[in-house]
Regions:
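Short, conserved beta-turn/loop elements at beta-strand boundaries and strand-helix junctions
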Residues: 344-349
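Conserved hydrophobic positions within beta-strands
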Residues: 331, 339-341
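Conserved RecA-like helicase motor-core motifs
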Residues: 47-57, 362
Length: 372
């Protein structure tokens, strides 16, 4: 999958570095901005210096910051900074004057800006937030992100914009669901608070501004005119490269031209990678090798398809089969110990643990939870 792909590329990078190749001689290219997230995440974990050219870090992109502002406000209504960021995103007729009046009322009555909202369009916004707070009680984080994108109007506003910039932003927002899905599968709990705590560790990336020796990450659109001794071209799968939105003959020819540009950026060696399956927008789907790879003369390719040693990954933590739990069942959780089921939905268990841990929402089919 996409994690194996990143591990493979990082392993090859480390081999190059061990032979004396500087980081600055290496580039990782991809078709869509949304693909950068998993590379950022793993390079950061392994303390490998990198920069992104032609875009921002995933968590520094405006639309992702806007979404995080919604999530933080839903979790904590006293967060005035998050409220100020998202109250008029997308535009809903709440201008600077209204926001200043809300802030003044909050200061007068020594309360949060959220509590100071009493009428007008701001009250409509507040009702949306209250509705989303209720939604959070009964769905997974990935399902919840969909509800936030819909009820906030963010998704629809970007669709209506009908521009390449809007399409890219929407792709990034949809990719955020892969972040929540990975979190759920790894830890098994439905906790917006714990999710945001984890995200905060990677969302405030300090750029290696003073270090000229760093790997370059960029889309194939941004690489025109640049060359690197060693290039990794990732995600060569149908629907990614060529892009899923390219239907006409002319659009496919433009994608093919981009592929040529990407391939010819490598001065010494080029790696082309693809996956057998990939998490896209929170859904895992089988991958089909890009037609562009199949069009390359096989004699020019030195392929690697066998399993190679790689960093140990945690096993999949979700059972495919549905497991039956009932109200009152005694259960044991790997981390939280013994507890009692106090609510059951299609996908979520609400479990009361001891007073130090309290009540937790847990994915019903996660391996961390079992009946006792």
């Amino acid at each position: 999958d996409e994690i194996d792909e990143v591990f493979y590329i990082i392993r090859k990078i480390k081999e190059l570095i061990s032979k004396g190749v500087p980081y600055k001689d290496i580039a990782i290219l991809y078709r869509t901005n949304a693909q950068s997230r998993v590379f950022e995440q793993e390079l950061l974990k392994q303390n490998i210096p990198f920069r992104i050219v032609g875009s921002f870090y995933f968590y520094s992109r405006k639309e992702i910051k806007d979404l995080l502002a919604y999530l933080r406000l839903i979790l904590n209504s006293d967060d005035d900074i998050s409220l100020t960021r998202c109250i008029n995103t997308p535009k809903r007729g709440i201008g600077p004057k209204t926001i200043s009046e809300i802030e003044a009322n909050a200061n007068t009555y020594n309360t949060s800006m959220y509590e100071a909202i009493k009428d007008g369009k701001a009250l409509d916004f507040k009702k949306v937030i209250e509705e989303l707070k209720e939604d959070l009680k009964s769905c997974t984080l990935t399902e919840f992100i969909d509800k936030v994108l819909d009820k906030s109007g963010m998704r629809n506003a970007l669709k209506e914009e009908k521009s390449l910039e809007a399409d890219i932003r929407l792709e990034n927002l949809e990719e955020f669901k892969s972040v929540t899905k990975n979190f759920e599968e790894r830890v098994g709990i439905i906790s917006l608070e714990e999710f945001l705590t984890e995200i905060s560790l990677v969302s405030d990336i300090e750029e290696y501004k003073d270090d000229p020796n760093r790997i370059t990450l960029m889309t194939v659109h941004s690489v025109k005119g640049l060359e690197y001794p060693y290039v990794f071209l990732a995600g060569l799968e149908e629907g990614i490269f060529p892009h899923r939105n390219c239907y006409s003959k002319d659009e496919l020819e433009e994608e093919r031209r981009l592929m040529y540009v990407a391939i010819t950026r490598a001065m010494k060696k080029l790696w082309i990678t693809c996956t057998k399956k990939r998490m896209i927008y929170g859904q895992e789907s089988p991958s089909i090798l890009s037609r562009f790879v199949r069009e390359i003369d096989p004699d020019l390719i030195d392929g690697e398809t066998k399993e190679e040693p790689k960093p140990v990954k945690k096993e999949k933590r979700i059972y495919k089969e549905d497991r039956v739990f009932n109200y009152g069942d005694k259960v044991h959780h790997e981390t939280y110990g013994d507890g009692v089921v106090i609510e059951v939905t299609n996908t979520i268990l609400t479990v009361a643990f001891n007073k130090d841990i309290g009540i937790k929402k847990i994915l019903k089919n996660h391996k961390s939870i079992r009946r006792v």
